[in-house]
Amino acid sequence: MNVTSLFSFTSPAVKRLLGWKQGDEEEKWAEKAVDALVKKLKKKKGAMEELERALSCPGQPSNCVTIPRSLDGRLQVSHRKGLPHVIYCRVWRWPDLQSHHELKALECCEFPFGSKQKDVCINPYHYKRVDSPVLPPVLVPRNSEFNAKLSMLPRFRNPLHQTEPPMPQNATFPDSFPQQPANALPFTPNSPTNSYPSSPNSGTGSTATFPHSPSSSDPGSPFQMPETPPPAYMPPEEPMTQDCPQPMDTNLLAPNLPLEISNRTDVHPVAYQEPKHWCSIVYYELNNRVGEAFLASSTSVLVDGFTDPSNNRNRFCLGLLSNVNRNSTIENTRRHIGKGVHLYYVGGEVYAECLSDSSIFVQSRNCNYHHGFHPTTVCKIPSRCSLKIFNNQEFAELLAQSVNHGFEAVYELTKMCTIRMSFVKGWGAKYHRQDVTSTPCWIEIHLHGPLQWLDKVLTQMGSPHNPISSVS
């Protein structure tokens, strides 16, 4: 269908607004989204004119263009629902936009989505895309002056060995994660002392940052992603500053070093570089690996229990995988995986959203560190909930600290770069399964960027003072 025939049944106002549409795909979906918006804006005097002014003069100041907030915050387009500001930012600015986590409201916006007011601003130029943070290089000393007697390893590692429970502790989202407003009072989780260097929110306070729904893509959109669940909690929007870094690219990943660092001869800077595949995912049944590793090149990945004959590179379909040793428990569990989990990587952060009707269970040391939980804690994510499971910036800070404490301290961080996740069945102190290898269906996620960064840092550090082994 060409553009002329497509527009033959559209109103002049919709035609005009579609003239500013970005991207070439899903013309019909964009038309329906704009048509739904026009019907709402016609009820407000001057709203259409203000939107056209914003779209035609993107560099000029413009007023909020609002529509009423629905009960669940979502807008239905083509029988599916999405968050309104995401839908129209996708239509008019960023066709590849996947989630509301990628957007921040500008200071000039009076009705940002996150403010929970009765009206929502959908002016695409009142939002800015979240940029991946530029991670500072790790400075590795060229000459080792490390004194083993002054090692922090006893504090860094021994607590893990001394307080390691017979099986992992458990936490449930959102019950175990206090949902506090921004600038809330500090909290101390009821879990054993973290074995990592003091976490940012262990005794210093934390704000829950897990909205009920991270995704706002849907099968009616250009991305063929699932329907957006309603957001149950979102922190207030933080004002955007005008000096944010531009979207991450390979040039920004190795930024120009300050003169005082570049002139130093006693350190070797090791910069973070974004890999071609941000993660690999391996599927297991009990303690048996099944199938080949899935390499994630897209920032948005679905891991589900279905089959996909089209071999979509954004989907890892576990239903395709066969295993001659599969028992009835595994078969039954696989039937309940359903829509599975949505993993996505944005702004240097990894999120997991449970799309399955059954809960998923996640063991992420980075997430546990952030919340002050014991490193091996297993977090339950119920259906239609999401959780941030890795933060590049916090990992960078830990790595920079650990370099000064020796090879072993840096090597210990490799455990943080692997995330384990089980479907339907959990494990840990509250379950009869003690280990993830006892769960019927689970995946292991390897984060390539952090792992490769660690490898480069360890290479610069040379050999360890104590041999690294499987029991070290």
Curated annotation (Swiss-Prot):
Chain ranges of the MH2 domain: 278-472
Biased composition (Pro residues): 227-238
Localization (cell): Cytoplasm; Nucleus
Domain MH1: 12-136
Any single Pfam family the record assigns to this protein: MH2
PROSITE patterns: MH1, MH2
Ranges of Polar residues composition bias in the record: 169-182
GO molecular function: DNA-binding transcription factor activity; DNA-binding transcription factor activity, RNA polymerase II-specific; I-SMAD binding; metal ion binding; RNA polymerase II cis-regulatory region sequence-specific DNA binding; transcription cis-regulatory region binding
Main location: cytoplasm
Known role: Involved in ventralization. May mediate Bmp2b signaling during embryonic dorsal-ventral pattern formation, and may itself be a transcriptional target for Smad5-mediated Bmp2b signaling.
Subunit structure: May form trimers with another Smad1 and the co-Smad Smad4.
Family recorded in the similarity comment: Belongs to the dwarfin/SMAD family.
Protein name: Mothers against decapentaplegic homolog 1
Biological classification of the source: Eukaryota, Metazoa, Chordata, Craniata, Vertebrata
Gene name of this polypeptide: smad1
